[in-house]
């Protein structure tokens, strides 16, 4: 596949990012995506130690962040990686913000810029205080001009960007409700703005490829507008709300999807609903495209063995040819390697050679990782995965699920028992990985215990156990930093799964 990439997410030190970039081409990836105009927020999360008060925060100045951005690009260029940039943040720039993350603004939109913002809930202001999540009034000509001028200026100043992602605001049910905007759809407006952007880039003599996004409201295909110059653009299908308890099918027929109602959208959870939206878009755009998916962005924390999510990734990638796309980019934490890095390994290998059986990848990876006795490690991780539920972790379905509580109790017992059977390996690399698996058993016992009470409807005890889990991983983070993103697991657990933020 032409597109084999990873997008920066989570909380990251500069060393984390540089190590990951070094690893990418060695494993068959060819692209890396730096979100926002500058990827400030991902560095800020780590150096401020957000969600881990046991570590002392480090202040970053603008010059520090700029130096990190340059260092990352130099590392990419050295290895010949395709450079993707920006995505969200353009709308924030029009409204007077830097557009370098999902930061909460301490003020309202400046009065002179307020008419450019979407009218939502009877007012034109930052959506829930976050500029990057704030749409514009796309029927406003000045808003369209400023938005596209900003992209052209960035493309001119950043010739290193092979692909520039032009997305609207993040979040959903936050589009403009003014009379003019309601005469059309946000997807039609998006396509017209893409055409305007192409005209401006052409006049400026800029060859930059533009990636456009099928995501949330924009999953719905336009009703009238069409892209006039397909060669400029690359379609990116981003089914962020999909289930990860199943994979994309090799044989697919569209299904009925709910009609779009402005600012009353229910995000589609089934694979079939999401793919039906993709098929509708492909009727109006037949150019280059790739899947932008999230197995290692949130759902993976719900798979305590990482074996089920690895299999989903493998099968998803083998289904890409069914949908006529040219690759895959993973929106993920870079430190998604707890208990193992097997899912990322599977992703890379499947994208470069689809002939390799999953079982061959498994045996090669784990025999190298654990040495003698690796089969026991695999059997344990597979049992954890079989009992885990990524949908529950991602807040799909009710929180009260007694049958699931039984599975979490079983997980706790499995982890407790397996700790007694961890061998003392001969080689240091094997010993380190077995020791990490011992850590993961303790991690699993604490988290599964909290999930067991949550799925029984006992919120108070669930939160108490979750706080114990957080205390444990916060204390352990200095030793586990390269493999476990403490910031992100706590953020997802409290934003989606249903736990309360611990002290």
Feature map (PLM): residue ranges:
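Histidine-centered catalytic/metal-binding microenvironments
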Residues: 394-503
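Aromatic-lined carbohydrate-binding surfaces of glycoside hydrolases
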Residues: 3-270, 274-278, 282-285, 289-317, ...
